[in-house]
């Protein structure tokens, strides 16, 4: 049965006058297009959803039944986006179906995302609107999609109700829904102050740890519907104006600056929670805002949030004055305000007077600090600094140019087979490492008595050798102290005077802890006797390293001279002089005369016997190399055989002077005692002719 004509006219009039006033995108083909509706559908893949035609829910004051009675038909189209081609939807009646003014998806698929346009029209009238549908997947490891959440805020200590949103289409009027709640996708033992009512979760007293994501889960048929709401907890809404932290309201703050320099005035304030209202903080000079000043040199920085907690903020803003002039001086005020009031505080920008006293004190303080630093550096690195200066700018030591040696080395000689575990390192250092480093590495010329002194030389010869040296090095090993190796310097008057008057500089090397050793008190007395004395500690094998403090200190105390270090090839000549360098030679004529005299007095049978016996014994006892010389059968040594050689023998000085020893004619020569008679000893190498172990 058709409706009466007056009734249809009234329906059309009501329909056309009840249109929602919104911005229309335009009209095409006589159809009014309301573009995309503000309501957007967002659903997880696999969940059901109902899309309603928005024309019946806000654009016109009618429903689907009245429109259909008025002869209007409803059609659905789908497009990928605004302006794209729209194609009619073919409903299959199962997964996607048209039911009155809606489309049902049971369930949704990813390809269902897009714009769905509903159009109502007849032959004379047309209107359409598009509805957006987004189908997404859960985030990895979560039960929700972070882009499809609802957002709620709650104030601390107040109550908050969280609803399970947009589930009206899945509720039955005759049945209570069964809804499960999760926090961060996990079941939770809810505290008693949290209550569940139908489709809501009620928190009676909000706490800070209530912040998080709440997910409600509802079963609809064979499907699951989930909605997630993120709850943010804030401080209670403030009813007070902001609080100025700096400058303070109660007093005027003075900030000094120099003309021509830059000035920075910083204002800090605390803002309570005021909802979504941003903090308002700014500077003024007098009654003018900073941006209203004519000077471009004066400007405000951006507002910076220093701290934020539960919506409460501590913020700051700076006023910068570039190249301060007289006109920039004056009073500046910082204002802060919110809906509850306004506060301000002032800063007086003042010209700084030059304070010459302070500047002078600062300059003197800087000089004093520099002086202290320089003295400290010099104290710590004095030796390194002096060595650097000597090596690059120093001149050779002129005092003592007429002396032949850089140093006289005094030590106690102990055979290696007598070294023990406690003193072995000290003896090796004194006999091998010390002379080898000084001569071969640093290039010094040493007088080593064991090497350079005529074996039977007397104490006057030692004094002359010390006098020809620029330094006296005494190596204080435990054996040296026990044997009182310094006695020679006390017995000879000339040597003692040299030490007391400071004619020679003494370097005393202590190789170990000497306290408690016999004769140690005499060592201390000796130190007080020597006028020019330097004591250097040798602390064991770690001091043997070339870059150690020990070698730097010793090089500093030695005379400075520009000498190329002696190489191993330079230290040895054709006569194989030994490990410590050039040897002193004895006059060839005197040695020949002495040898002839000595051998002439010896029994012929003892010559070869003693020669072999003495050499074999001394080779076993001494650690230096030994050298053999063949004695001519005539008992005299040709002059050419000892020329250009360093030949040594254990011959008394009386024989070198041409004297002949007195012997008893009635005494038979004893071969076993032949080695004790120095008058008949043959020519021996210098290693086996040492008559003393202390030099």
Swiss-Prot record:
Glycan-linked positions: 63, 122, 138, 213, 264, 331
Tissue specificity annotation: Detected in total brain extracts, olfactory bulb, hippocampus and striatum (at protein level).
Signal sequence annotation: 1-24
Residue ranges occupied by any TIR domain in the UniProt entry: 403-558
Ranges for region Interaction with NCS1: 548-643
Result after altering residue 37 to A: Decreases affinity for PTPRD. Significantly decreases synaptogenesis
Entry remark concerning the domains of this protein: The TIR domain mediates NAD(+) hydrolase (NADase) activity. Self-association of TIR domains is required for NADase activity.
Name of protein: Interleukin-1 receptor accessory protein-like 1
């Amino acid at each position: 049965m058709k409706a009466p004509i007056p009734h249809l006219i009234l329906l059309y009039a009501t329909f056309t006058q009840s249109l929602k006033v919104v911005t229309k995108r335009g009209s095409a083909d006589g159809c009014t297009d309301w573009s995309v509706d503000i309501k957007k559908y967002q659903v997880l893949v696999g969940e059901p959803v109902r899309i309603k035609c928005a024309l019946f829910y806000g654009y016109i004051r009618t429903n689907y039944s009245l429109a259909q009675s008025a002869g209007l038909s409803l059609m659905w189209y789908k497009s990928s986006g605004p302006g794209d081609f729209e194609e009619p939807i073919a409903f299959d009646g199962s997964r996607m179906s048209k039911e009155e003014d809606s489309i049902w998806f049971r369930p949704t698929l990813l390809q269902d995302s897009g714009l769905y346009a509903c159009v109502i029209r007849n032959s004379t009238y047309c209107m359409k609107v598009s509805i957006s549908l987004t189908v997404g997947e859960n985030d990895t490891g979560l039960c929700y999609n972070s882009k499809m959440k609802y957002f709620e805020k709650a104030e601390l200590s107040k109550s908050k109700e969280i609803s399970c949103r947009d589930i009206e289409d899945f509720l039955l009027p005759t049945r209570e829904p069964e809804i499960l709640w999760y926090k961060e996708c996990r079941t939770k033992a809810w505290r008693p102050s949290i209550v569940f009512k139908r489709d809501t979760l009620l928190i009676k007293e909000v706490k800070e740890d209530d912040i998080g994501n709440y997910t409600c889960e509802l079963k609809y048929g064979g499907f699951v519907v989930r909605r997630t709401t993120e709850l943010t907890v804030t401080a209670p809404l403030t009813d007070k104006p902001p609080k100025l932290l700096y400058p303070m309201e109660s007093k005027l703050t003075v900030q000094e600056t120099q003309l021509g320099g830059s000035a920075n005035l910083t204002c800090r304030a605390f803002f309570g929670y005021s909802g979504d209202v941003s903090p308002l903080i700014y500077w003024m000079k007098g009654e003018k805002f900073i941006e209203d000043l004519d000077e471009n040199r004066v400007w405000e920085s951006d507002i910076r949030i220093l701290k934020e907690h539960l919506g409460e903020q501590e913020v700051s803003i700076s006023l910068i004055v570039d190249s301060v002039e007289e006109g920039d001086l004056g009073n500046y005020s910082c204002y802060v305000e919110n809906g509850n009031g306004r506060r301000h505080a002032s800063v007086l920008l003042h010209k700084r007077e030059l304070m010459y006293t302070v500047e002078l004190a600062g300059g003197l303080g800087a000089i004093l600090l520099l002086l202290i630093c320089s003295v400290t550096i010099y104290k710590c690195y004095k030796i390194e600094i002096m060595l650097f200066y000597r090596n690059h700018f120093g001149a050779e030591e002129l005092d003592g140019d007429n002396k032949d040696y850089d140093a006289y080395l005094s030590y106690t000689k102990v055979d290696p087979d007598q070294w023990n575990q406690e003193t072995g390192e000290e003896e090796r250092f004194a006999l091998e490492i010390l002379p080898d480093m000084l001569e071969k590495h640093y290039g010094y010329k040493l007088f080593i008595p064991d090497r350079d002194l005529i074996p039977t030389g007397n104490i006057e010869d030692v004094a002359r050798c010390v006098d020809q040296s620029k330094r006296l090095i005494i190596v204080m090993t435990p054996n040296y102290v026990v044997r009182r190796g310094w006695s020679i310097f006390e017995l000879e008057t000339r040597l003692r005077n040299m030490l007391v008057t400071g004619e020679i500089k003494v370097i005393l090397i202590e190789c170990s802890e000497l306290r408690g050793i016999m004769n140690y008190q005499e060592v201390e007395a000796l130190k007080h006797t020597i006028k020019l004395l330097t004591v250097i500690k040798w602390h064991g094998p770690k001091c043997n390293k070339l870059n150690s403090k020990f070698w730097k200190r010793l090089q500093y105390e030695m005379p400075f001279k520009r000498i190329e270090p002696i190489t191993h090839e330079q230290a040895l000549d054709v006569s194989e002089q030994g490990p410590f360098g050039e040897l002193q030679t004895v006059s060839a004529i005197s040695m020949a005369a002495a040898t002839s005299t000595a051998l002439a007095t010896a029994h012929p049978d003892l010559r070869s016997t003693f020669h072999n016996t003495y050499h074999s014994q001394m080779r076993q006892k001494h650690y230096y190399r030994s050298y053999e010389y063949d004695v001519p059968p005539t008992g005299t040594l040709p002059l050419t055989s000892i020329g250009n050689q360093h030949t040594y023998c254990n011959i008394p000085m009386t024989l070198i002077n041409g004297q002949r020893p007195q012997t008893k004619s009635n005494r038979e020569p004893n071969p076993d005692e032949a080695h004790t008679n120095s008058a008949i000893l043959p020519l021996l190498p210098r290693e086996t002719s040492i008559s003393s172990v202390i030099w």
